[in-house]
Amino acid sequence: MPTQSTSKRLWRDVQVFDGLVQLSEAMTVLVEDGRIAGLWPAREFNEAHAQGAACAGRGGVLTPGLVDCHTHLVYAGNRAGEFEQRLEGVSYEEIARAGGGILSSVRATRAASEDELIAASLPRLDALLADGVTTLEIKSGYGLTVADELKMLRVARRLGQLRPVRVITTLLGAHALPPEYAGRADDYVSLVCDEMIPAAAAEGLADAVDVFCEGIGFSPAQCERIYQAAQAHGLAIKAHAEQLSNLGGSALAARYGALSADHIEYLDEAGVRAMAEAGTVAVLLPGAFHVLRETQLPPIELLRQYGVPMAVASDANPGTSPICMPTLMANLACTLFRLTPREALSGMTAQAARALGRLDLGRIAVGAPADLCLWDIQQPAELAYAVQAGRLRQRVFKGEVVYAR
């Protein structure tokens, strides 16, 4: 169906999950000029509230557009061979130390042009959109040179121009140590701080800076240098932390006011407390946990106890989470991590937006941008309960119905 365009439209008699909770009765929602202009219980709605509005949808479940707050969507090649290796008992760390893992994707991505990366990435982006995504973060991290990291960020920005979706970009220069810097990690960190971050900031290509704080990545001291450089250039901070061990990376990120700490399977109470005090979001990545067949669960009860917001993301990447289906992540977050369906759905909407520093997104509230999904289901929990394609009836971006069936 072709894209529809009108400045004023209604969704009537819909069950609403507003990004935090399911509203208690059927609602009518008015969108005008790209924003949510009204929200009424259906039984109280009066036509005078919305004169001239076209009815865009009736019935079903209306949620905020999904926000995928952690992806590595831009890359070339694949790592299916490593998937087989892991099934044969070779660990992720062993593969990485042997020159595979992230560095395998680095070789392929360095060799690809921007246009080739666009062609490789568009099908993955389209899969996310078909599952209800209206905003996503895309990280670099498979270039590991100034030129190649900027190339990846430019591709990410172009993807947001080629499709009706909001793309937030994150510079992940400290994803792995490139082979040409073997044994010289501090020198590479200097490159990230002195050249990569300034170049990305000068071109307006990055909204945030991320690091991989891990034994096979970068030390807390090295990550701290990168945080200081990011702050000096006005960029937000994020962290891959406590995925394989506890180096205190989440607490370090929190001290620098990080938007989020991601993975966090080995996070301890001190780290949880630091995140709570800083308002840092815990981004759960059940896809990587599932694919790597991990057993160390993130400390969900501690996160609840301290009131740390929990987001859920796909971590779409070629090695450890080659999955472009956020609703599957909701199911995995519930079945593997014991989130409630409400927590999982909030984690893919309001809390995911918080992890990107976009408190205006991921909500159905008067004044919020009208990024919406209308689903052919009876209650919001079904998005986490059942793993199933084809439930999306409409995807609305900035008030425009950009997909309908």
From Swiss-Prot:
NCBIfam families in the record: hutI (TIGR01224)
Residues binding N-formimidoyl-L-glutamate, per UniProt: Y142, N317, G319
Top enzyme category: hydrolase
Binding site for 4-imidazolone-5-propanoate: R79, Y142, H175, Q243, T320
InterPro entries per record: Amidohydro-rel (IPR006680), HutI (IPR005920), Metal-dep_hydrolase_composite (IPR011059), Metal_Hydrolase (IPR032466)
Species annotation: Ectopseudomonas mendocina (strain ymp) (Pseudomonas mendocina)
Gene this chain is encoded by: hutI
Protein name: Imidazolonepropionase
A GO BP entry: L-histidine catabolic process to glutamate and formamide
Recorded metabolic or biological pathway in which this protein acts: Amino-acid degradation; L-histidine degradation into L-glutamate; N-formimidoyl-L-glutamate from L-histidine: step 3/3
Lineage, broadest ranks: Bacteria, Pseudomonadati, Pseudomonadota, Gammaproteobacteria, Pseudomonadales
First-listed, main subcellular location of the protein, grouped into a coarse class: cytoplasm
